Amino acid sequence: RGKRAEAENHLNDILQSLIFERTEKGKDPYWNDTAGQLARGISKLILMMEERLSIKSILDWRHAKMQSGMLQNCFLALSTDSDIYQDLAGFMNLTAENTKTCIASTFDQLTGLFKASKALTEMMSGTTFSMEKIGKERTAIFLVVPDEKTTYHFLAELFISQCYESLLDQADACKGELPVRVNFILEEFC
């Protein structure tokens, strides 16, 4: 139970960066919020189905499995008091097709960067290192993001946030202190 709650907190942090915080100033947050609930519901459904959760699998459920009716079938099989049902209901129970289309379009707009770049989607769907090693052994990570183009800045923020959360968890497990000192050097970071 503790690991599940921790995993859901990490999922919420990621979705916060990818979707919820990306509402433009002056715009109605309803669209991003509902698209974010859809993303959270799909993510939790993927985990419930014991599939590997990644950007790629979320996009697969949003497009192929939504179009085939599989998402609808899974939704209808859920208990109405489950958190997955509650997350998906804001979208799935809509009867106004225009509203539903606008929410799906908002979802697609917020995840379009990944859909447009297969290389980015693949990179975000796996890892070649363990975050836990950062606080346990000497490690250098170079994250290069173009400073003249802000498109990918939120991904750098997401990585740093996830890394920091991982380091906090490790420090808690090691009586408040990491085995190896960790320095973040952020150059020209906005």
Where does each model-flagged region fall?
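P-loop NTPase motor domains
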Residues: 1-190
